[in-house]
Amino acid sequence: MSIPFEVISATLALSIGSFMNVLDSTIVNVSLTHIAGDFAVAPTQGTWVITSYAVSEAIFLPLIGWLTKRFGIVRQYTLATLFFTGASVLCGISFSFGFLLFARVLQGVVGASMIPLSQTLMLSFYPKEKKAMALGIWSMTIVLAPVLGPVIGGWITDSFSWRWCFYINVPFGILSTYIVHSIFRKKGYKDKIEKVPVDKWGLIFLAIGISALQIMLDKGNDLDWFQSPFIISLALIAFIFLTILVIWEWYHPTPVVNVKLFLNKNFSIGALSITIASIAFFASVVVIPLWLQNYMGYTALDSGIATSTLGLSILFTAPILGSILNNLDARKVVVFGFVLFSITAILTGNYPPDITVSYIAGSRFLTGIGLGIFFIPLNTITLSDIPPEELTGASGLYNFTRNIGNSFGTPLAINYWNNRISIHHQDIVSAINVGNPNFQSYINHFSSPLHMKLEMINELITQQSALMGVNDIIIGSGIMILLLIPLIFLARRPIVK
């Protein structure tokens, strides 16, 4: 059966929108030093460019179901994409660091609904036997974007300016908005709008709780976690207000966040699984480029290219899996993906000191195959038992849990990596026998002063410790994914509707 041109056009437009949105969460990661330098702020302050976007998006993701009831799905998506494009322009023309942060907050607020709504709209174009394929295409853009973000950002920053990391959104945002609006208007689509009352207290509890949680996650590593009174305060605020939010929304007749979705067995299993899987996946995505840049002498662009093969394998895996998923038990496919991801991580998590670019690229490619296999059917399992009228809200909440996993994964991975570096460094130093003839021969081989020889040896030990720490991260991520397998078997088998 051939696919109509308007379906292909809508798929392309919606994929561009979701890709552009997710891309902006990582594209500036490699440009922070340039941004901080341009505005004469400390490098540590530069990270607020990431935090401000993440916090505002995290607050509004759970609100998607409520927002679409008030404004309609198509109108909400097109306005969100258009405003996101405008906010990108504001980021690019920023004349001060404060204005840039304001523009990034605006990006997160208006763009939060783009991801779940692009999924909902894309699925609406396909018949039931093709929905899995549509989901495969959509999932591909979501997983590819954070992997390719540093590569694209590094190239743009090196070749042009960090400001073009934002300007690049303009033509794609306008194109996505125009195509989606035109196609749905041509189809005579009418948005269903309900005058849902505003749950003001729910909004307040959500904003305070999520803001505190996201800032705690983003700044915890920099402030030594719970050694900092600021982080402790944020943790308490997040716990108190999110607990109040759950209780309040549970009994509210028109909640901004439908927390009762977690009573759905498949949704709860899927949300928990994607949170943990995102932590495991993002750990290596963050740490490997840092290791390549800080210890192996790679540039940001080179490290991004070396690891981008993970996205390349997803590019091939997702559409193929999507086309055959309806004929398979999604639970078994997820488990197969988990096993493949874990085996690949455990077997390749033994990087040698003389590692080559091809070895890194090959190992990330194999890992990406497992990731691509489990990501799509896990989405299918999660949303399989959700009523149509709650699907958009459930998609927003599911994507929120994925974002939380990413947010947890980054600081946890960096903190764990630093701890493993310290442990391995101590172990290697304690194992050195200064009286060993081989050690003495190595020392005497150089004519430098003794203190320079010791500094050089310490640098070699640190480099080896960092490598061993990376291997620990990769193997640990594989083990985390394996532990999710029993949870998947508790889910009901999704039925194609």
Where are these regions (language model features)?
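Small-residue-rich alpha-helical segments with characteristic i,i+4
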Residues: 147-148, 360-439
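Hydrophobic transmembrane architecture of multi-pass small-molecule transporters
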Residues: 403-490
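Transmembrane alpha-helical cores of Major Facilitator Superfamily
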Residues: 19, 51-55, 82, 136-140, ...
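C-terminal membrane-cytosol helix-exit motif in multi-pass small-molecule transporters
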Residues: 171-189, 207-219, 237-251, 485-492
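Transmembrane core module of solute transporters
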Residues: 5-69, 74-80, 88, 98-100, ...
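Membrane-embedded alpha-helical segments of multi-pass transporters/permeases
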Residues: 89-93, 177-182, 243-247, 346-350, ...
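Helix-loop-helix hairpins in multi-pass membrane proteins, especially solute transporters
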Residues: 61-202
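Cytoplasmic loop-to-transmembrane helix junctions
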Residues: 45, 130-137, 390-397, 469
